[in-house]
Amino acid sequence: MPRLHDHVWSCSGSGAARPHSLPRGMIAAARCPQGSGAPEPAPRSPRAGTAGCGARPGSWHHDLVQRSLVLFSFGVVLALVLNLLQIQRNVTLFPDEVIATIFSSAWWVPPCCGTAAAVVGLLYPCIDSHLGEPHKFKREWASVMRCIAVFVGINHASAKLDFANNVQLSLTLAALSLGLWWTFDRSRSGLGLGITIAFLATLITQFLVYNGVYQYTSPDFLYIRSWLPCIFFSGGVTVGNIGRQLAMGVPEKPHSD
């Protein structure tokens, strides 16, 4: 009997030892799925990354074409309206065969203005990204529309207002142009690009007038009007705001989806 009793206790001891050995087996079994499952996400992440990288260039080019078309169309329409306004006020004079056309303007003026608007509108957000200074001041379409209205008003004032001399008119339009920049832009890149655009556009206009393509009435500054750089400056700021707003809508689409 003692031997049987000892044998029973030995069996119970071995049975009691099994529960102590089970957690180790369970821990080992629990570690196996982690080890086998760990490499699984590794091949998935490169595939997702390559798919995203492959989709980005196509979407970026598609967005670039869309923004270019919108800016080009805006430049064409604005050129037709503002140029017609200046012709009616006898500020800009074209040859007689040009005035006989349906739009009372040279055929090359709207395409050139549209191309310039597309270049300027794409350049503004590009310069902002390179400088690392994203423009976030008044980023809504209502502000952009007000900026367009102010720019049209400045151009209308240049053709309609009568001052004692051109210096007073130029100073007034310069103050209005700087006020437009301060109200709707307030960025150093916008100020620098606006001044650069005004300088280059004035040189191109002087070249065209000097070669007899068209002319201005009462020129007072190297064959042109002295207030013309102010118009180019405010136009550059306006088109730049449109380009920034169009570029700002691009990253918002994935978040909305």
Curated annotation (Swiss-Prot):
Membrane-spanning intervals of the chain: 65-87, 107-124, 140-162, 166-184, 190-211, 226-243
InterPro entries in alphabetical order: INSIG_fam
Cell location: Endoplasmic reticulum membrane
Keywords assigned by UniProt, alphabetized: Cholesterol metabolism, Endoplasmic reticulum, Isopeptide bond, Lipid metabolism, Lipid-binding, Membrane, Phosphoprotein, Steroid metabolism, Sterol metabolism, Transmembrane, Transmembrane helix, Ubl conjugation
Covalent cross-link Glycyl lysine isopeptide (Lys-Gly) (interchain with G-Cter in ubiquitin) as placed by the record, residue numbers: K136, K138
Residues carrying Phosphoserine: S187
Membrane topology: Multi-pass membrane protein
Main location: endoplasmic reticulum
Presence of the UniProt keyword Endoplasmic reticulum in the record: yes
Site location (Required for the recognition of 25-hydroxycholesterol): F151
GO biological processes: cellular response to insulin stimulus; cholesterol biosynthetic process; SREBP signaling pathway; SREBP-SCAP complex retention in endoplasmic reticulum
Pfam short name (any one): INSIG
Ranges for region Disordered: 32-54
Membership in a protein family: Belongs to the INSIG family.
Subunit architecture: Interacts with SCAP; interaction is direct and only takes place in the presence of sterols; it prevents interaction between SCAP and the coat protein complex II (COPII). Associates with the SCAP-SREBP complex (composed of SCAP and SREBF1/SREBP1 or SREBF2/SREBP2); association is mediated via its interaction with SCAP and only takes place in the presence of sterols. Interaction with SCAP is mutually exclusive with PAQR3.
PANTHER family documented for this protein: INSULIN-INDUCED GENE 1, INSULIN-INDUCED GENE 1 PROTEIN
Protein name as catalogued: Insulin-induced gene 1 protein
Source organism: Cricetulus griseus (Chinese hamster)
Name of the coding gene: INSIG1
